Amino acid sequence: MKTISVIVPCYNEESTVLTFFGEAERVRRELFTPLDVDFEYLFVDDGSTDKTLELIKGLREKNDRVRFISFSRNFGKEAAMLAGMENATGDFVTMLDADLQDPPAMLRTMYDGIVDEGYDQVAARRVTRKGEPILKTIGANAFYKLIDKLSDVEMVSGA
């Protein structure tokens, strides 16, 4: 059985983390169980000040597919993403935000691109960052450039 590590960086996501998990589990059951593919959920709490970590711990108690990392303070989404990549154990690794801005169902299309089409990597790319605070956009762009320079994997901004 193959496993997909779904890395979920979280910062004050108490209003969305349970909804995200429910939708991701539905996708796993309906679209991946028939393929004999399982999920590992790796939530990375980036120093949330709300009940995000408490909710993640509750998910962990009920589901052995859930793992988590908890930061002592807010280090930023990029640090959470990196910690997730360093601790993922699946055959495939992906990242999804808990706010469901990118639907978990797109994972099936991405998986098919790797398995059926033979790609080494597949990425979804946000075409525009419209409406996002300028500092967040600058930070995200800097992260993608850094990863591009430090790794053999090309990461396009917005991916």
Give residue spans per PLM region.
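Short beta-strand/loop segment that forms part of the nucleotide-sugar
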Residues: 8, 32-47, 69-70
